[in-house]
């Protein structure tokens, strides 16, 4: 029936949207980690700037010189460093509030639990209806998408160990997945869905 036949395109359309949002949440999570590194460096720079101001204030040969204010350049440098720390802290807090790490994990779980079974359901349903498969870009790209989802998930343990190569590979794999989805799966899938609607009846 039409409902069963359209289950695959509807589910895979949802998976495409989930892939887009997973990419967004993943990049936000990566940005959060990078901000943590930047914030650590900025705090060290701010501490060094404040120390320079304090050392200059106490470096005079006499009490009168010691009480002299530090040069404006040192004060400005310390102020600028503090401003950078404040800006990065605020930016990090905003991203943390988005809870992107957990969202990214949840979307990945959905793609594995729904996307891969539905990717298999498509050709199975076609074979049950037509008695044969129709090899072409849609089928080949679908196999590629499902395989790349599995590869991306397989990289997670190494990513959790802090391996940068795994993180880079994870991003690259998912970028290819998006390309296959957008360039092959969506256009060819819409054509197939139109034929299914034309040749089937409810339910």
Kindly label every feature range from the protein language model.
Residues 1-203:
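Membrane-embedded alpha-helical bundles that constitute the cytochrome b-like, heme-associated redox core
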């Amino acid at each position: 029936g039409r409902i069963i036949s359209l289950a695959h395109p509807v589910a895979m359309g949802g998976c495409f949207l989930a892939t887009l949002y997973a990419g967004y949440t993943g990049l936000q999570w990566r940005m959060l980690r990078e901000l943590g590194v930047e914030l650590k460096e900025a705090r060290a720079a701010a501490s060094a700037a404040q120390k320079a101001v304090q050392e200059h204030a106490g470096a005079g040969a006499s009490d009168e010189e010691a009480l002299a204010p530090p040069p404006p350049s040192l004060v400005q440098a310390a102020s600028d460093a503090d401003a950078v720390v404040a800006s990065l802290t605020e930016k990090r807090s905003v991203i943390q509030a988005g809870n992107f790490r957990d969202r990214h994990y949840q979307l990945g779980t959905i793609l594995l639990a729904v996307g891969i079974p539905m990717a298999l359901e498509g050709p199975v349903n076609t074979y049950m209806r037509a008695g044969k498969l129709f090899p072409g870009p849609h089928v080949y790209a679908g196999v590629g998408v499902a395989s790349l989802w599995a590869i991306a998930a397989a990289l997670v343990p190494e990513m959790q160990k802090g391996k940068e190569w795994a993180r880079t590979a994870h991003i690259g794999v998912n970028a290819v997945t998006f390309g296959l989805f957008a360039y092959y799966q969506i256009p060819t899938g819409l054509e197939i869905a139109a034929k299914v609607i034309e040749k089937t009846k409810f339910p």
